Amino acid sequence: MPLKVSNHPLVADSLRGLRDRSTTPEEFRVLARKIITFLLYEATVDLEVKHGKVQTPLMQAAAISIAHEVVAIPVLRSGLGILGPVLELLPRVSVGYIGLERDDKTAVARIYYQKLPQLVDKVPLLLDPMLATGGSAAQALDLIKEAGGRNPRMICVVAAPEGVKALEARHPEVQIYTAALDEGLNDSSFIVPGLGDFGDRLFGTES
């Protein structure tokens, strides 16, 4: 299972800001957007293309377009916070949704919503900011496969080794793109050092 941890200094600098507990929700959103833009570049650099022609004001020129439609699939709710750059940068992108709610006592997520288009001959791109135990991502990837998705890609901001291993065992074909591979999980199955609850910090709902 390919795992790509970004080594770009701008990603590392933005990640420092995300980790800082004094970062405001407004600042957090800006930093997350920067990181996702870089990770999206890395996750799409090898997309299949098709060659054609385009008419410029002066003459015809060779042109390249993306061969297969990309379907962005954010995991609710935190995945919504990293959807923006994907919609702006990818041509002809469609969006599916998977709603997963984590039980803080068991760290197991339940599916409460799903709306996926047909994924045959498309490129599934799973958006889930934190890859902790891997349970939620594995469930989401199960649904993606059931909808016909093959060779999915996943963008997360921070990953834990436990989550990577879980996906490697259950979905070895998935390609993971992340800003950081952290030390591991604590007793509550939160990533450490991590950056806290991504959704709460993004949407300003920390208690």
Protein language model regions, located:
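PRPP-associated nucleotide enzymes
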Residues: 1-207
